[in-house]
Amino acid sequence: MNLLKKKSLWLGALLLLLLGGATVFVIYKELRGQDIIGTLKNANIWWVLAAVCAMALYAVADGINISRCLKLAGYKISFAQMMRYSFAGFFFSSITPSSTGGQPGQLYYMAKDKLKVSHSAFTLLCALLSFQCAAVFLGVFGAVCSHGEVFKLNGKFAYVFPIGFALNIAIIIGLLCVLFTRRIAGFFAEIGLRLKKIKGLKPGDKFRFLRSFAAYRKAAFLLKLNKSVFLKMLITSLAQIILYHSVTFFCARAIGCSGLDWFTVLRTQSSLFISVSSLPLPGAAGVTEYGYALFYADLIPTELLGSVMLLSRFCAFVLPLIGSGLGLVLLSIKPKCGKGQIS
């Protein structure tokens, strides 16, 4: 084994150790002081399995949307690759502050599969736009069905809810501009080129950068011509978010909240999610828990609310974090490279 291979092996082992440590730390922080074992023992296992299956389908739906956009750009990816990108998004979002590592992690695995950065970036932005549109639609739907109660909440964090709505709308507008407005996309490309100049351009760097921008614009043009692709992505995102919100319903039933119906949970979770999901706050998790207690105060008995919240967090975050991490390791053992058809 030569020196380069040994160095690569050691770096890989170190990275795996760091990621494993980060995963253990996040799980410890989530479950510290909580009796998750006792909660699971007292829960109906079939409803818990339903919650786990919902999150598994959530990951598959995410992978399907990524594969749709890549297929439009001329790539043929396997189911394993599709799931690897999905797992990377969830895993790195979960272990990084403010969920900033999701897209970079996905770009890394796409680059390993020889996908062009321009096509990968466009694909992830489209998937994000689809998800945001579906989340806002369901959030507005939930707020309307609850007669606008989300805007009438009182308390220390009441201000975050209307701000959350506004931020999500702003994100959608920004994504639309970056994806489909040539001038704004060109503006960001110019910024990127200037940053490269500061670091020092090598021969051919400018040409490669402009070529990547042209490929990005070509992918955007193809999506405009194939609007049905984005419509399918939007429908998939709606199903994906509904599955995610259904986890709370399954967990509530598992704990014994037999009087709580699925539609009530859907509209409540939709309003809560759209309110706090895009807030760039260090204590966003605390805000979510406060909102959870506030939204469900009249829906779930006080003595069961803590157990439902804990079980929901375990099924919607902790288990998927472990599963996505293991999935990444297993699916990266024998990676298969896709081939792009667009230059």
Regions found by a protein language model. Name each.
Residues 80-89, 126, 263-274, 304-314:
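Alpha-helical transmembrane segments of multi-pass membrane proteins
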Residues 1-38, 92-201, 281, 285-343:
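Transmembrane helix-loop-helix hairpins in multi-pass inner-membrane proteins
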Residues 198-216:
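Short, membrane-interfacial amphipathic segments enriched in basic
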Residues 8-11, 42-50, 221-235:
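Membrane-interface helix starts
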Residues 34-42, 110, 212-224:
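A short amphipathic helical element positioned immediately N-terminal to and/or at the very start
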Residues 220-274:
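Transmembrane helical segments that form the transport core of multi-pass membrane transport proteins
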Residues 63-87, 251-268:
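Membrane-embedded helical hairpins/re-entrant loop segments and their flanking transmembrane helices
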Residues 48-52, 87-95, 125, 230-239:
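Hydrophobic faces of transmembrane alpha-helices in multi-pass small-molecule transporters and flippases
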